[in-house]
Design a protein with these regions (language model features):
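Sec-dependent N-terminal signal peptides
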Residues: 4-14
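Acidic, small-residue rich beta-repeat scaffolds with periodic aromatic anchors
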Residues: 20, 24, 28, 102-173
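Beta-propeller blade termini
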Residues: 25-47, 91-104
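Acidic/hydrophobic-patterned starts of short beta strands in beta-sheet-rich repeat architectures
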Residues: 46-58, 101-112
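Beta-propeller blade repeat segments, especially FG-GAP/WD-type strand-to-loop junctions
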Residues: 65-82, 124-128
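Short, surface-exposed coil-to-beta transition loops
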Residues: 65-67, 94, 117-122
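Structured domain cores in non-transmembrane regions
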Residues: 77-102, 109-113
Length: 173
C-alpha cells in the first residue's frame, strides 16, 4: 500500500513538473504575499500573437478590508487594474462571478444588490491594437417582488482603454 502511494506521489510530481499547486492562497510570485489570487484567466491564441496575457481577480492582503482588484498582466508585468467596490460597504452583496474568454477578448461578470433589486453586469473587454478596451456593458436588473427583468445594453462611445488604475464604481453609472 505504501509503495503504491509513493508511486502515485512520484507520478504526480512528474506530471506537475515541479510546479506547486496552492488552492485558495496564491500570490503573484513566491516573494510577494500581498495578493490572494481568487481566479486567473490566461488569454492565449491567434488574437494575441506570441503574447501571454493574464487577467486575475485578487484580494489585497495588506488592506484591512481585503479590497478586490482585477489585474491585467502581460507576462509578469501588471499594466492595468480595476479597483472593485467593497462588499456591503460601497456596494451591497458585490461579487465577481466569473472571468470568461470571448472571441475578441474577455468578459467580466459581476452581481450585486439584494432585497428589492438584483443586478448582473457583464463588462465586455475587447483586445485590439495590442491593448484592451472596455467596449460595452450589459446590465440586467431583476426585481424579485414584481418578477420583472430588464436588460440594458450600453456600448461605449469611446471605448475605455485598460491602462493604470480604474475604479469600478465609476463604470457602474
Amino acid at each position: 500500500m505504501k509503495k503504491a502511494l509513493l508511486l502515485l506521489f512520484v507520478m504526480l510530481c512528474f506530471a506537475l513538473q515541479g510546479k506547486c499547486i496552492n488552492i485558495g492562497k496564491q500570490s503573484l510570485s513566491a516573494d510577494n504575499k500581498r495578493w490572494d489570487v481568487w481566479q486567473t484567466l490566461a488569454l492565449k491564441g491567434q488574437l494575441y500573437g506570441k503574447r501571454c496575457y493574464q487577467i486575475r481577480y485578487v484580494r489585497d492582503n495588506n488592506d484591512v478590508f481585503r479590497r478586490g482588484y482585477i489585474l491585467f498582466l502581460d507576462g509578469k508585468t501588471s499594466f492595468a487594474s480595476l479597483k472593485l467596490p467593497l462588499t456591503d460597504d460601497e456596494c451591497k452583496n458585490f461579487s465577481v462571478d466569473s472571468l470568461m474568454q470571448t472571441k475578441r477578448g474577455f468578459m467580466l461578470l459581476v452581481t450585486w444588490g439584494g432585497g428589492k433589486y438584483l443586478y448582473t453586469l457583464k463588462y465586455i473587454v475587447c483586445y485590439r491594437q495590442a491593448s484592451f478596451f472596455l467596449d460595452s456593458i450589459i446590465t440586467q436588473l431583476y426585481e424579485p417582488e414584481k418578477g420583472r427583468k430588464k436588460t440594458t445594453y450600453k456600448r461605449m462611445k469611446r471605448p475605455l482603454k485598460m491602462k493604470g488604475m480604474i475604479a469600478l464604481p465609476e463604470l457602474l453609472d
